[in-house]
């Protein structure tokens, strides 16, 4: 069997580096690493590289440094299906759309944004009038939406890179009496799924975090057993809507 040691960084890249130093003092066989920030991760990863300890990144990539494998949701595809659903919901009339981005420098935000824009940028009638950074935070998502509604009162839809920001946008829309706005989030957390059931959110992209966790451990096990492992693995995501939830129930 294996002994699992966990450290949490609380979204703090500096704490993450301290955690890595503490972890390396234990001389682990392999490290599973979910970076706070893809850019800042390079310096933290360098500590493990210099120590000769193999690292598998999970969920977010490190933009520099060496890893033996990377495992994450297919965030590009997730952003794309969210964008396609918004296009479908707006129909031929199209309309003005808001994008609330995740934290700058994270691969999840970059990839979800990429997929979203692949879906909407070339669609006639769709105009992304606001694309601001909400840092995965509900209050920031709400503020972005409040400001967007003031500047663009005819907004028809929102894509938020996570459900937390989507819920903030939803509350801003409710306060403005704009429950008609199509809002799509990402993560399928419990509050968002309930909001989809209630018709307050149009949809949310569901990840499979359990597979990321078990898949990371499986990759580490195979590596330690001397087996060849994939350099990169994408985990499937799906769009959850009210119709789908009614069908599942």
Question: Which residues does each predicted region cover?
Answer:
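A residue-level marker of the well-folded mature domains of exported/periplasmic proteins
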Residues: 1-249
């Amino acid at each position: 069997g294996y002994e699992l040691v966990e450290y949490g960084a609380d979204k703090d890249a500096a704490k993450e580096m301290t955690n890595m130093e503490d972890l390396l003092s234990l001389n682990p066989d392999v490290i599973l690493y979910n970076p706070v920030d893809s850019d800042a991760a390079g310096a933290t990863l360098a500590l493990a590289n210099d120590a000769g300890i193999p690292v598998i990144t999970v969920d977010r990539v490190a933009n520099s440094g060496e890893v033996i494998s990377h495992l994450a949701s297919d965030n590009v595809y997730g952003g794309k299906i969210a964008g396609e659903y918004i296009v479908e919901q707006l129909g031929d009339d199209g309309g003005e759309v808001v994008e609330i981005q995740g934290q700058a420098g994270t691969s999840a935000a970059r990839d979800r944004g990429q997929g979203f824009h692949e879906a909407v940028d070339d669609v006639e009638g769709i105009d992304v009038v606001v694309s601001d950074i909400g840092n995965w935070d509900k209050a920031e998502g709400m503020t972005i939406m409040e400001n967007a509604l003031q500047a663009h009162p005819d907004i028809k839809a929102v894509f938020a890179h996570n459900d937390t920001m989507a819920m903030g946008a939803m509350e801003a829309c409710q306060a403005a009496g704009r429950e008609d706005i199509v809002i799509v989030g990402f993560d399928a957390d419990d509050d968002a799924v309930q909001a989809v059931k209630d018709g307050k959110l149009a949809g949310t992209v569901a990840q499979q975090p359990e597979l990321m966790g078990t898949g990371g451990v499986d990759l580490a096990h195979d590596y330690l057993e001397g087996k060849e492992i994939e350099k990169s693995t994408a985990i499937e995501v799906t769009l959850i809507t009210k119709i789908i939830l009614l069908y599942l129930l």
